[in-house]
Amino acid sequence: MAESSGSPHRLLYKQVGSPHWKETFRQGCLERMRNSRHRLLNKYRQAAGSTPGTASDRLLVQEVMEEEWASLQSVENCPEALLQLELPLDLAVLQDIEQELCNEEKSIISEYEEDLEFDESCLRRMLAEWEANSLICPVCIKYNLRIMNSVVTCPCGLHIPVHSTDLTEQKLRACLEENVNEHSVHCPHTPVFSVTGGTEEKPSLLMNCLTCDTWAVIL
């Protein structure tokens, strides 16, 4: 669909700025793109991981440029000198800024994909270790858990008394795997485990995910 002559994007090509304002616009766009990481990744996930650099991905670049231009033109942020500009803006400047934003967008997506791949690798490793004969402690992911006299312990310092007298390593492993697999259905990131509670409160083993903000009590 062709853009109207009065659209914010087209207006970018009908204004001019001194080198000072061009640099201000450029820096503002880059900062706005970095601050829009959550919005960009939502668009990326909704597009089911389409290749960065396509028209749908560059849509955020256009939005960022239009938003920053509108911010520069606001009464509070824009000196009178900028409001009086009328000459055509150098297209090469806008194209350079647009390309720089595209590169920043690709960098954000690439970093997200690397983090996602690392999380998936950690999840596979965690599940593989749990399927082994020994039950790896989910908190330190280093030492083996032991269950003796209804107390779950680990050399890392984990010490959790449990009410159930028939809790075994097999049952605890099954519980851990069930919760991790249930979480992975709706979130690809690896959850973390921690122990809460103090001297006046029974310690508990919790699973939580910093990405999707979900949590579950394991013990």
UniProtKB/Swiss-Prot annotation:
Residues 164-180 are annotated as: Mediates nuclear export. GO terms for biological process: DNA recombination; DNA repair; DNA-templated DNA replication; protein import into nucleus; response to UV. The keyword tRNA-binding does not apply. One of its GO terms (cellular component) is fibrillar center. The modification Phosphoserine is found at residue 18. It is found in: Nucleus. InterPro entries: RIP (IPR028156), RPA_interact_C_dom (IPR028159), RPA_interact_central (IPR028155), RPA_interact_N_dom (IPR028158). GO terms for molecular function: protein-containing complex binding; zinc ion binding. Pfam families: RPA_interact_C (PF14768), RPA_interact_M (PF14767), RPA_interact_N (PF14766). Keywords: Metal-binding, Nucleus, Phosphoprotein, Ubl conjugation, Zinc, Zinc-finger. Its main location: nucleus. A zinc finger (RIP-type) spans 137-212. Sumoylated; required for localization in the nuclear PML body and transport of RPA complex in PML body. Upon UV irradiation and during S phase, it is desumoylated, releasing RPA complex that is translocated to sites of DNA damage. Sumoylation takes place at different Lys residues. Interacts with the RPA1 subunit of RPA complex. PANTHER family: RPA-INTERACTING PROTEIN, RPA-INTERACTING PROTEIN RPAIN. Mediates the import of RPA complex into the nucleus, possibly via some interaction with importin beta. Sumoylation mediates the localization of RPA complex into the PML body of the nucleus, thereby participating in RPA function in DNA metabolism. This is RPA-interacting protein.
